[in-house]
Amino acid sequence: MKIYYEHDADLGFILGKKVAVLGFGSQGHAHALNLKDSGVDVRVGLRKGSRSWEKAEAAGLRVLPVAEAVREADVVMVLLPDEKQAQVYREEVEPNLKEGGALAFAHGFNVHFGQIKPRKDLDVWMVAPKGPGHLVRSEYQKGSGVPALVAVHQDASGSAFPTALAYAKAIGAARAGVIATTFKDETETDLFGEQAVLCGGLTRLIRAGFETLVEAGYPPEMAYFETVHEVKLIVDLIYEAGLKGMRYSISNTAEYGDYTRGDLAVPLEETKRRMREILRQIQSGEFAREWMLENQVGSPVLEANRKRWAAHPIEEVGSRLRAMMPFLKARVMEEVG
C-alpha cells in the first residue's frame, strides 16, 4: 500500500483552481479553513437560511448558495451528510458543474453505491481524513496533520490523482501520510468499522457490561465507571501503542483476565461469523438500499432507536458523573450546513 507525503504532492495542481466546499459541519469547516490558510481560492456552498452561514462568514470565508458556489468552482468538494448528497447533487450540483471540472468527496458511499453517477467529463476523486474535523483543523494549526485516504474513481483530465494529492496536502493530510485506496475499499471498510466495532459493536459491549453489573446488585455509578468511563483509558493505550502496547501497560491481573475470559464475553469465531454477515450486507448494497429507503420515509427506525437508547439508565448515570468531572469538555456536533 503506497503512502504519500508532502514531498510527493505539488500544490500547484490545486492553487490554480477555484474550490467550493459544500457544507460547513465537522469536516467542512476544517477543509475550508485549512484550504484558505494554504492559499487556495475557496468558497463555501450552503443552503439559504443555513445556521452555518454566519459561522462561515465569521471565520473569514466567502459563502454562497450551493448552486452559485458550484458554478464558480473548478473543484467541488461535497461534505454534506451521506443521505442528503444525492438530491443536492441532482438539483444543484450537476446542472452547474462546469465541463471538465472535478467532483470530490471525503467518503465514497454515494458514488460506490450508485446514488451519484457523475458525468463522464468530470474527474471524480476522494480525500478522506481519518479523524474528525476538529482534529483535522487543530493538527493543521499545530503544523502537523491527520492521515487521509485518497482515491480516484474517474480520471477524465489525466491529472485527477495529483490534484487529489495536492488537495490532501493543502488540508494538512500529507504531513502525516496519505494512503492510496479505492472508493470501494474505503466505503466498505468504513461502514464495517462503524457497524461491527466502533459504534454498533462497542455500544452493545458497553451496555451489556453495564446491565450485567447493575442487575447483579452493584451501584450503577460503579458499573458506569468500569464499563464506560474507563473505555477511553484502554482505547488511548491501543491508539498510541497497539494491542501489545496496551497489554504491556495494564496490570498482570488485567492481562491474564483478558486472555482467559475475553472469549466468554466476545466468542471470537461466533463474533466473526456474525461480522461476516454484516460485511455481506454492506458489500451487496443491502445496507445502502435500506438506509436510502429509511430516509425517503422520514427516518422512523433511526428516530425510534434514538429515543429508545436515550432513555436507557446509562445516560442518566453518565450525565450525573460527567458533571462531577470539570476536566471533561462536552463536544456538541453541529449540523452540517
Curated annotation (Swiss-Prot):
PROSITE patterns: KARI_C, KARI_N. Pathway: Amino-acid biosynthesis; L-isoleucine biosynthesis; L-isoleucine from 2-oxobutanoate: step 2/4; Amino-acid biosynthesis; L-valine biosynthesis; L-valine from pyruvate: step 2/4. Its EC number is 1.1.1.86. GO terms for molecular function: ketol-acid reductoisomerase activity; magnesium ion binding; NADP binding. Mg(2+) 2 binds at D190, E226, E230. Substrate binds at S251. GO terms for cellular component: cytosol. Residues 182-328 form the KARI C-terminal knotted domain. It is an enzyme of class 1 (oxidoreductase). GO terms for biological process: isoleucine biosynthetic process; L-valine biosynthetic process. Mg(2+) 1 binds at D190, E194. It catalyses: (2R)-2,3-dihydroxy-3-methylbutanoate + NADP(+) = (2S)-2-acetolactate + NADPH + H(+); (2R,3R)-2,3-dihydroxy-3-methylpentanoate + NADP(+) = (S)-2-ethyl-2-hydroxy-3-oxobutanoate + NADPH + H(+). Involved in the biosynthesis of branched-chain amino acids (BCAA). Catalyzes an alkyl-migration followed by a ketol-acid reduction of (S)-2-acetolactate (S2AL) to yield (R)-2,3-dihydroxy-isovalerate. In the isomerase reaction, S2AL is rearranged via a Mg-dependent methyl migration to produce 3-hydroxy-3-methyl-2-ketobutyrate (HMKB). In the reductase reaction, this 2-ketoacid undergoes a metal-dependent reduction by NADPH to yield (R)-2,3-dihydroxy-isovalerate. Belongs to the ketol-acid reductoisomerase family. PANTHER family: KETOL-ACID REDUCTOISOMERASE, MITOCHONDRIAL. This is Ketol-acid reductoisomerase (NADP(+)). It comes from Thermus thermophilus (strain ATCC 27634 / DSM 579 / HB8). The lineage of its organism: Bacteria, Thermotogati, Deinococcota, Deinococci, Thermales.
